[in-house]
Amino acid sequence: LESPPEEFPPEILPEPPAAAREPLLTLPAALTAYILLLAIIHLRVLLPPDLENWTIDVFGFIPKRYDSSLLAIGFPGGEGAKVWTFVTYSLLHANLSHIGFNVLWLLPFGSALARRFGAVRFFAFMAMTAAAGALAHLATHEHALAPMIGASASVSGTMAAAIRFAFVRGSFLSFSRGDADAAARVPAQPLWHALRDRRVLAFLAIWFGVNIVFGLGSIAIGAEGVSVAWQAHIGGFLAGLLLFSLFDPVPRAAADAADASS
């Protein structure tokens, strides 16, 4: 005869194994390295004032540096600064609130993009959007002497690129999202299809409205004080939105396959 199955009193029933909980926000290595780079570079504020100002003049983006009518004026950094400042300005910040604000916006969107692109593509993308922001600032401030600094053109680019896939079913702004890696690698919508998505359009309207009215992230430091370089944000944003596909390693979905419904 078989013995009846052993029964446990309710008070000594074995507890089921706890389900693994995914952290709300996990940072990929590429994004962590980028944020650490910003933090390390920001230690320049500990330098003597003259030397700190020199770093801004050499690595900040100064539109007047490209004014051909100023042949007799030499800017710090020489001819090389005409090249590297298209990117290096984005690694400089005025103070902790400036760098903290940019990092805060970078965390959700940059995290998804770094997982999707991988380290090399991610850093190349950040450099490209920084350069696009500098070009937009140069086009609208041709004779400005105030150096522009701040990562917000690149941050804006990550936000624009991320909305190409953020609302797709299973992605990180979808109600049916999977784990962080899977959410970052859903097929992106074709641009024309994304621009028909009401949520994408709402995001675009809010983003452009906030930037035009208030300005966020990048600043220009001059004798007249600090001003927001919102044109650089728009340059980085448009570059991220339009050039996303050049960096995206995930095969594109057909318009009917990339269903944006959550």
Predicted ranges, named:
Residues 2-262:
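A detector for small-residue-rich transmembrane helices and their helix-helix packing motifs
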